[in-house]
Amino acid sequence: MQKLHFDVTGMSCAACSARVEKAVKALDGCCNVTVNLLKNDMTLELDDAKLSQDDVVKAVTAAGYGASLRDNDSNPSGKTKTQKKNSQAEVLQQELTATRKRLYWSLFFCALLMVITMLPMVGITFSFFEGAQKAPAFAFTQLLLTLPVLVLNKNFFTRGFKALVGLAPNMDSLVALGATASMLSGIVSLYVMLYAAGAGDWSTVSHHAHNLYFDSAAMILTLIGLGKYFEARAKARTTDAVSQLVSLVPDTARVIRNGEETEVPADEVAVGDVLVVKTGERIAVDGVVIEGRAQVDESALTGESLPVEKAVGSKISAATLMHSGHIHAKATRVGADTTLAQVIALVDEATSSKAPVARLADRISGIFVPVVLAIALVTALVWIAVGADVEFAMTLAVSVLVISCPCALGLATPTAVMVGTGRAARLGILFKSAEALEKCSGISAVILDKTGTVTEGKPIVTDVRVFASHLRERDLLKLAASVEVKSEHPLAQAIVRSARENETGLYEAKDFGQQPGSVFSKINGKNYSIGNRTLAQNNVAILKELETLSEAGKTALVVCEDNVPVGIVACADTIKSDSAEAIRAFKAAGLRVMMLTGDNERTAKAIARAVGIDEVVSEVLPADKAAVVKQTQQQGARVLMIGDGINDAPALATADVGMAIGAGTDVAIECADVVLVNSKLTDAVSAYELSGAVLRNIKQNLFWAFFYNAIGIPVAAGVFFTTLGWSLNPMIGAAAMSMSSVCVVSNALRLRRFKPTSRNSLSSFSTVAAAYAAYQLPLEQRSKTMQKVISIEGMHCPHCSGAVTKALTKLAGVTSVDVSLEKKCAVIECEETVTDDVLKATITDLDFEVTGIETK
């Protein structure tokens, strides 16, 4: 099966997209067909053995629309959207320009028409149109002013009547029928006036002079055009997030070829070329720094505002800005392979898909226009049957036609999805489909892989303990690194890295060897070995320290000199700075949080306590992670799985929503529904919050679209005329129809201002750091509880005390909270590990002042 993208022309409403989708789905050999009204495109999977691309184009053409294979599919030139200036944003801009031009001329002629028809109603008359004898000239002038408006908006008629002939009426059909009915009514009245004038029947002339509908036809088309203009302008803004990324890619790049610095077009840079990037320039392709240092602004890709330092070996990405410095970098990924191109491709893929919540709107869109036509016909017949005059019945029928709006239904979901995924991309969150975007908001449980997700996945030296009087900590670290330098074990590499960072230097080690549980070497004539607790022999002090370090979740290695234990070097996989904050946010949202790890139970629980996780599944094999996810689902939970490694891929695929850390493996990213570019766990919270915001926005849009039609059509049909006297002029109906689509698109645009709560407070990071420092204490110290009285200034109402209570209750280790407004204090029961710094930072985050903390 081949996945293809087609550009579709001629669609104006949800009925159009439903018609195209139905026509293509009927072809044998096509599946997963999705038509996007907002983007005017279609994606599908094609079986080459059964069907050709031309067959798809013919099916769309037969349905009354145009289709062409997108250039990126038909011409694999390697150029990407980042390198093609004829982007979707520019197409939308061209549409906006053309719509604006039509609108301005329509408004001009419509204004002239309104002047001669409306001013006499307020006493401002024109002598050359006064009197029954001049009424035919007055009517003919209205006709002449209306004709340019019809010509300017001829697309409504050509598309609308073509769709009617093809038995697939759409919004254009409704507008065309409404405007045509008004025009025909006016032309009939004009002929009646001419015949009556010839017969000298001036009363008939006067009567029909006040029942011309030329102004209605012109106003219907102009107001619909006005709505289309606002809609086109809003559509152009929905792609801002991605189009801004596209615009950041420079047109040229400087490369070194044949020993000389040369400027070439960015799309001619090849893998292996050496780039030269200076301060203030944007990087054209992905690469790795081979010379120099720099500060790079990566906010375009990651959403992070602070520049990132780059040195030799650091990776750089296309579209990022060189804040300061000068580097040479080797191009590693160009064209469609760059990170930026992949981000845009993922966003494009997501916006081309459909959210499950849109299915009801799709089903209704397929029958909406025929039902409206039937309602308009029934409206006219019923009113004529009950004795109303033909003109009144026709007015109501035209109102029904022009007020009905399938556009709002068709735009409700894709606009919210497009703006939401674009905003997510700016925050460094990539949703692969609209379904993932919707499902993410419905999760009830979060399962986290430990290594690389909660922790950095890179061990560091945390403790150096010396048990020999002739050694210092620095000496012990130097000895340990000198022995471990030839080992490939991650802990050995952490020790060597720590020695180099502390500039201890290394001894010359000889006769390196290893055996189960330890490694050994000879340094300065002495035998040194490093390994597990078996090397501690029966040294009580060392065994006790090993126990303490183990309870803190650290892996301790014993260092021996001539078979005598002289010290301990402990390593640990450090917790990410934002892990505790993210987990607190998930729990505050009412989600169940679990952690999976292959580590032993003691280490796993130590890490879990440090970040506030209550449920831990330790010593789990990679193959069993998916089973844990499935078991959680069987308990009724909708699971979000977050991981980064190859061994997480089955679990990511099994979960309701799989979320991959961006720094993870390609396999994990491939299996995931969502990718976190920044590798930050707080971005998972942002994804959850944004998903909820998008789903709420879609539901608001759908409600408005359904509510508008449910109220507007009966009012236009005159249902309330006999009881309340309510009826709608076709011009008002046309204005309402236009504004309904504008309201839907404008509501979706509010998502551009979405701000995740995890990025609102800078002080929260200091809170996390303080909490992590507290949890490095041994287990037996952590189990003690105490009472603390926190004096607080700034609380004035129950809302204030409630906010303090809620914030303190969320802290790991706090067992009870009692806040008194009268005494201006909070009394808490907590474990000894909850430090004053943590408490103060938590309350300060709420904009209250802590004046004192007393421990009892």
Across the structure, where does each feature detected by a protein language model lie?
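Residue-level signature of catalytic and energy-coupling elements of molecular machines
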Residues: 13, 20, 24, 44, ...
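Conserved ATP-binding TGD loop and adjacent catalytic N/P-domain core of P-type ATPases
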Residues: 2, 18, 525, 553-555, ...
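Flexible metal-binding regulatory segments at protein termini and peripheral loops
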Residues: 1-137, 235, 260, 341, ...
